[in-house]
Each structure stands twice: as C-alpha cells, then as structure tokens.
Amino acid sequence: MCLVAFLAIAPAGWHTLQMKCSSQSEFPRIRRPLADLPQLLELGDPARSRSVPDDAACFALWDKYDMLPNIRRHSFLVAHIAATLAARAVASGFDVNVSEVRAGGLLHDIAKTYCVRHGGSHAQVGAAWAVAETGNYAVAQGVMMHVWWPWDLPAGRGICALPFFVMYADKRVRHDACVSLEERYDDLLGRYGHSEAAREGICAAFRQGKNIESALSEQLGWTLNEDSFDCGRLVS
C-alpha cells in the first residue's frame, strides 16, 4: 500500500499529501515512552569538553559491530548530508561542531545490523554503544533520537543542533540514495505499514520530518526539499 492510498487522497501531488499528513485530526497524537521523561540537556553545546571520533574511528566501529555493507553505504550518505547542513549552519553564524555532527551520522545505525539479527531498538542499543565507545554524549544523543524526537521541536535557532541534522539527513536517504521525504516514507509504508498502528506511526514521523525540514529551511535560508546534496557523486 502506498502512502497516498493509505491517506485516501486524490493523486493531486505531494503538496496535497503534505497538507493531509499535517492535519492533527487525521491521526491521534503518537505516544512514545520517552515523551513522558524530561527533555534531555543541551548535550550539543560545543563548549563542553569531549573527544569527537573521526571517520577512521567510526569506520573501525563499523567493523567491530559487523555493520552490513548496505547500512554502511546508507550511513555514509546520512553523514554527508548531516555535515553539509551543519557546515551551512556554521556559515550562517550558528555554533555547531561539524565533525561531531558527521560522527553522529556515521554512527546513527551502528546497532542496526545487530538488532536486525537479534531484535531490540537499534537507536537505544546504538546510543549505549556510542557512549561506551566514544564517551561523547552528544553523538550518542544523535544516535538515540534519529528515529523520533519525542518532545516538542525547539523553536527558532534551537533546531540547528546535532540531533536534528542527523534526524533530517536520515529521513532523506532511502537505502543509499537521496530522495524526498515523500519518497522515503512511501517506501517505509510499503515495507513496514502492515498494521493501523504502524501506518499511524509512519505518518506521524513523516509529519515530524516535514516540520523539521521547514524549520531548518527557515533558519538556514535554504530550500532543503529541492536539494540532493550532491549525493549522486558519492555513490556513482
């Protein structure tokens, strides 16, 4: 089932889809356990002293945790997009650690292979591994939150932070190709939307992704949905 069919809307283009998925009346508010916890500290504060794993260190962790080749390709593109966003933020006057954002992208799916084989939340397991292996809590936060942000999105400049760069980048990469959010979530619905609850969760994540996209576009002065981030050159 495609995302358009699930939403029962006429094939009037993705703009209609965006408006439909933005309607809070269509789906109940998705409740996740983390939403009942206090919001995390601002772990992305560049003033905090911590080491940042470079590419070689991240690739070594890929090997250590036996990351599948397709997940490596996906993670490499996510890191590229996230770092591109972070570099644009720095150029726009934001205090962002680009290397740290890149590390968050490279490691966001570090536990995906393990959880595919053995079960569990790859975001939660991966965040625990990221803390244990790097001691960098900001990178671990990016790993932990790359699937779903359980609190209200920060207003204004607060959106330009590591978790949202990694989260948005992940939402723009289907396997090893940069695609629109609409294409990404149409694929997710086809593969995982086998129940009403699953379909509601996918659509909620799509809406959140569009909200992040709009907020980042506004802060960075960049029409993100029209940009492919030169990803084609990385996988050609």
Where are the model-predicted features located?
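Divalent metal-dependent phosphate-bond-processing catalytic cores, especially two-metal-ion Mg2+/Mn2+ enzymes
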Residues: 6-9, 13-49, 64-94, 107, ...
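Acidic-glycine-rich active-site phosphate/pyrophosphate-binding loop
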Residues: 49-56, 101
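A short small-residue
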Residues: 56-65
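Alpha-helix N-cap/N′ positions at the starts of helices
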Residues: 57, 121-122, 164
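Short glycine-/small-residue-rich flexible loop motifs, especially phosphate/cofactor-binding loops
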Residues: 59, 83, 127, 140, ...
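His-Asp-centered metal-binding catalytic motifs of divalent-metal-dependent phosphohydrolases/nucleases
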Residues: 78, 96-130, 141-150
